[in-house]
Amino acid sequence: MLITLQSISFSQRKNEEFKYFIKRSPGQIIIDGKEDVNWSTAQTATDFTMVLPMDTSKAKVRTEVKMFYDTAGLYLIAINYIDHGQKFMVESLKRDFSFGKNDNFLLFMDPFNDQTNGFTFGSNAAGAQWDGLLYEGGKADLNWDNKWNSAVKYYEDKWIWEAYIPFKTIRYKNGITIWGIQFSRLDISKAEKSSWAPVPRQFPTASLAYTGILVWDQPPPDAGQNISLIPYVLTGLSKNYTANTATKFRNDVGLDAKVAVTSSLNLDLSIHPDFSQVEVDRQVTNLDRFELFFPERRQFFIENGDQFNNFGYSTIRPFFSRRIGLNAPIQYGARLSGKLNKNWRMGFMNMQTERVINTKTPIQNYTAFAIQRKVFARSNIGLLFVNRDQLLGKDEKDPSYSANPFNRNIGLEYNLASSNNLWTGKYMVLKSFSKNTSGDDFTHAGNIQYSSKKWLIGYQQESVGKQYTAEVGYVPRKDYFKISPSISRIFFSKNPKITSHTIKVMNFDYFTRKLKLTDNTTYLAYTLTLRNQATYTAWVAHDYIKLLQPFDPTNYTKDTLARGTQHRWNSVGFELASKPQQLLTYLISGRFGGYYFKDRKSTRLNSSHEWISRMPSSA
């Protein structure tokens, strides 16, 4: 199957006829949201194509984009035309706002033209900035924040976004004069999403498989020396007057540094880092049998972090950076990552944590190495090695002794992405190494997905060994075999108020390694999507679980169910999402039915409301 699919990836690149020829700015440009005279000599990218609600016509709203560059960075101006006096829809002034709840304009860049990795910048109509890293062909990591400048100005018939992006902010290879480029606009009042280079409606406008081409009149200037130093000093004192203890003093000193080894290869250094400014996790009540996953938000781990953190699947991660530095302070860390050339990416990281006497946590050293090779049009093969070593405490008399002095993982992964993005998938194998553990320590998993306008068909299977151990990873469940097919069919409507009807069927089956069923979920859903982007969903589901460990489904009543007990229940539910054009938007969902206990029913209603600001245009 893979050989057949790969023949697709040799086909002609999509949208290569959409070319933007960028040239040097004829003069200084002030970033103020005004279209000054210098912009008159730049090429204009216009005639956007509608993506949603339908991708079969030109956009109804007019957008014009122009670009320049100078010795230090890129200039961009986006002129977003509206009806005379039309108000702008804005939900938040927060950086990296919610895409679907704000009128916005976004830029997607692929400096290596590999259709896999890139950068995104943009703004909503109120001027809130958006920036992130693109990976896996079009997924965006918005935890990445960097330095650049932008401004928004309002007019009666348009709003203008102007930006300047320094070359030091992005990563690119010197000498490459062909980049991937895409412009995207969302106008909520018109219920329209559009893009410069056409994108099929089933894909996000961030899809790097459908970018146009940015053609430089000469190779982009060298970014020059790029070194950032962030030192910190943290002092304080504390005293327990009740216990009358001595005053404790705190004096912490640390340093973070970022060094551009080349324009595409970056070195991050950290000594006694301080993560007190990192955004806190969203609070979640865990009613599941397994550990929850929270995303990495520490900037040290973000850039090119997909090479490490995205290896595998959401529940099979051989490396999870949040395992490092949360239960023991970090002494130091170094990370070298980036592009070697168009086809090769690499990442190397080494970190060491301090010894914690109270918890008997020894000094730990962590190493991760990843390398990735592009193959065919957009696919790649990746290798990952992860190592944790205990540096002290090998003597059993030492209070920090650990029975597991080391843990290692090595894995190989193939990521499939056809040139038109219709076929995607991956296959990976992993093996772990630990003291006094051998046999049944392999893991393998694979999936394949087909995404067309009318069909979304997928299949995934996983097999995790009983002895497989990823101490620096996230693998909440072991010793199982899983299969998960799914299929969705979209029926487009000729009714002017309805976009589509969607029927979706999913099934999840977990087995023991001897193929005895332990978990099953069968799910059927119907979704009605209106032209104004409101959606209404109704679903039914059947669940079966055989508990492998004692479990309290309520997490607080101590009604613990015994290991080996079997539980079946049926449930129904709904979800109502209002049209985003309303001043007060809502999302209401409900679930009714069984849940573990035969003599009890579960009813859950959730409701969230948001106020969307309508900002009047002004001259």
Model-found features: residue ranges?
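Bacterial Sec-dependent N-terminal signal peptides
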Residues: 1-17
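Outer-membrane beta-barrel proteins
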Residues: 53-55, 151, 217-219, 241-245, ...
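Surface-exposed extracellular loop regions of Gram-negative outer-membrane beta-barrel proteins
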Residues: 222-268, 366-434, 495, 500-505, ...
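Outer-membrane beta-barrel translocator domains and adjoining extracellular loop/strand segments
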Residues: 91, 134-136, 194-196, 241-246, ...
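Membrane-embedded beta-strand positions in outer-membrane beta-barrel channels/transporters
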Residues: 64, 104-106, 160, 228, ...
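Exposed, low-structure sequence patches enriched in small/polar residues
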Residues: 329-331, 337, 405-406, 420-604, ...
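Structural signature of outer-membrane beta-barrel domains
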Residues: 83, 186-188, 236-238, 274-278, ...
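Structural preference for beta-rich elements and adjacent junctions enriched in aromatics
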Residues: 12-374, 379-383
